[in-house]
Amino acid sequence: MSNRRDFIKKTTLGTLAISSVLGVSGFAANHENEPEAESKEKKQTKPIIISTWNHGLPANKESWKNLKEGKSALDAIEAGMKIPEADPNVRSVGYGGYPDREGKVTLDACIMDHNSNCGSVCFLQGIKHPISVAKRVLQNTPHVMLAGQGALQFALSEGFKEENLLTPESEKDWKKWLEDSKYKPVINIENHDTISMLMLDQEGNLSGGCTTSGAAWKMHGRVGDSPIIGAGLFLDNEVGAAAATGLGEAVIRTAGSAMVVELMRQGKSPYDACKEITERIYNKHKNHKDMEYLQVGFIALNKNGEYAGYSLRSGFNYAVSDDVKGHRMEDAKFKMAWDK
């Protein structure tokens, strides 16, 4: 099984000053890791939950528990995503997430239901559970997205508690980065750790959510793909759902998740849809300044319960939960292998 941290370390930009919390590796380009035809799609009965990365597994388990207890899909997604948001050892989400270059922890999240209702927050500070605030945006406002101070004001009006999210461990790593990098915008080992979750519930309805603290040491005010409906997350209940992880700028440039769903609408399988959009991102970025450290991954789930994951580079894995095989991790297929 691929190790998520090893994978993230290999996305680091090696030409910049490297601190002790960073890792570097090269890659071997154009290595196609094509699966056998029968393994391209994993067909399942509903319900089914898939989410990105190892820390998606405890999120899945909590969501599954809530779903089996009769909670709504949105409530189940919220409950699951709150698990990594509250875990200080997950340095890419919520409490304990790595800060921006100013030492501020800023959070992004979104959530979407089967009726295409959605809520989102970005550049939110001081609130441990942005997924819950995003859900309140969906439920209690006429808007889709609230940002920055406005998102914070809304959260406080909804009864959320403001608190310091910068843990001593994350602060220590940030200060080390400042010292070693001389304030250069280094891509950090924990940069690409968005938790994205997709769900097909007992009634056959789709929903999804994303939560992240974004790119470590990012410029203050930077927002990635995760809170953007159509980039980090998209679903159409008649077709399927998709979500992204990786370098948000690349996903935004291609409206990644929306394009995966549109390809499924045209008859593509979840695997083929994820693969085609990943190839599109590669073709648009192969001569781009981001390319030497670019990594993106997608997960997709269609109305029939077929699911898949695919990434540009090796190491991406995702959690799957269903009644057939229980809770487990699966490795995504990929286009390019990293050198060892």
What do these predicted regions represent?
Residues 2, 12, 16-17, 31-340:
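Alpha/propeptide regions of enzymes that mature by internal proteolysis
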Residues 26-28:
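Boundary at the C-terminal end of the N-terminal hydrophobic targeting segment
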